[in-house]
């Protein structure tokens, strides 16, 4: 009973920390976008605008949140929660340091893939419940995109799993003490990062909520706290994909001089900033190009990487 209470307290602290980090990340992103686009970005609330996310949170919480006419109210309310909750649960198996993990399960990678896949249901359910044609089109795009990119997302990380011989996050990091897997798996790392951006619905893969042709996609009819949960889920997904990339390919918490959790945080921040840089510099492709790249290019390359890794693993284990 005491252990359960301690776990609940640690979980609450972790969730609060993640919410603060996600909010701060929105400010960092807006400042970086302003720098790239030669403008200021938020600079009024707090030092250098660093508390802008707090003001935005207060604004979202005080806005009216009411389902549109003809909407399925229960599903409409549940969809935003499904967008954020699985991503928060995914952080429970992330190893932030040696022994610094909330739930040290042996199938952590598999659990994370499952949690990330659930976010597609939020988009589909929210789109269907909104009773809006633009929302429905965005939801169908989200479903097709997740189906395409979730496949080679899993295949791209299997190379690291094969080299480590385990699905445990801790074991994968420990297997990189001699050399990071990004050196042994450059193709797998690149494919994983591409699929991760698509799984998080980030530019240039944000066609499910493309403003140019779908108003706001599957979140067209959402406002207030419901919109905020979708927004939160997206930014948490970016951080989760960054943390997973660091764990699988960039040595996790391993590094000289500094404590492990600091190394993990710095590496994750670098990957997240790269995602922002991609958003600022790359154009949005056509939807047929997006799916064509997934099925015709990325999937065969993932299978090729898996085949080559299997050959190397078998050759290394041969007497």
Curated annotation (Swiss-Prot):
Its main location: membrane. InterPro entries: NADH_UbQ_OxRdtase_su1/FPO, NADH_UbQ_OxRdtase_su1_CS. GO terms for cellular component: plasma membrane. GO terms for molecular function: NADH dehydrogenase activity; oxidoreductase activity, acting on NAD(P)H, quinone or similar compound as acceptor; quinone binding. The gene is nuoH1. This is NADH-quinone oxidoreductase subunit H 1. Keywords: Cell inner membrane, Cell membrane, Membrane, NAD, Quinone, Translocase, Transmembrane, Transmembrane helix, Ubiquinone. NDH-1 is composed of 14 different subunits. Subunits NuoA, H, J, K, L, M, N constitute the membrane sector of the complex. Pfam families: NADHdh (PF00146). Its EC number is 7.1.1.-. HAMAP family: NDH1_NuoH. Belongs to the complex I subunit 1 family. The keyword Cell inner membrane applies. Disulfide bonds: none annotated. It is found in: Cell inner membrane. GO terms for biological process: aerobic respiration. It catalyses: a quinone + NADH + 5 H(+)(in) = a quinol + NAD(+) + 4 H(+)(out).
């Amino acid at each position: 009973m005491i252990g359960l209470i301690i776990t609940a307290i640690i979980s609450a602290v972790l969730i609060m920390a993640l919410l603060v980090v996600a909010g701060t990340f929105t400010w960092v992103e807006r400042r970086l976008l302003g720098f790239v686009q030669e403008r200021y970005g938020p600079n009024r609330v707090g030092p250098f605008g660093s508390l802008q996310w707090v003001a935005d949170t207060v604004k979202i919480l005080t806005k009216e949140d009411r389902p549109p006419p003809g909407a399925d109210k229960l599903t409409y309310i549940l969809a935003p929660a499904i967008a954020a909750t699985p991503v928060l649960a995914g952080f429970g198996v992330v190893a932030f340091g040696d022994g610094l993990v909330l739930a040290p399960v042996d199938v952590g990678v598999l659990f994370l893939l499952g949690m990330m896949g659930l976010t597609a249901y939020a988009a589909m359910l929210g789109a269907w419940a909104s009773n809006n044609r633009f929302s429905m089109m965005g939801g169908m795009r989200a479903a097709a995109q997740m189906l395409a990119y979730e496949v080679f997302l899993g295949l791209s990380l299997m190379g690291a799993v094969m080299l480590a011989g385990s699905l445990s996050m801790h074991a994968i990091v420990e297997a990189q003490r001699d050399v990071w897997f990004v050196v042994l798996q450059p193709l797998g790392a690149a494919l994983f990062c591409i699929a991760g951006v698509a799984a998080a619905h980030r530019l240039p893969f944000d066609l499910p909520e493309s403003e140019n042709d779908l108003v706001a996609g599957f979140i067209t009819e959402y406002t207030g706290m419901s919109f905020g949960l979708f927004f939160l889920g997206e930014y948490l997904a970016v951080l989760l994909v960054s943390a997973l990339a660091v764990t699988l390919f960039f040595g996790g918490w391993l590094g000289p001089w500094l404590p492990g959790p600091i190394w993990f945080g710095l590496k994750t921040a670098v990957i997240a900033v790269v995602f922002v840089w991609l958003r600022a510099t790359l154009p949005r492709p056509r939807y047929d190009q997006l799916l064509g790249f997934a099925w015709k290019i990325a999937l065969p390359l993932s299978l090729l990487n898996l085949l080559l890794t299997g050959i190397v693993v078998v050759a290394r284990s041969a007497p």
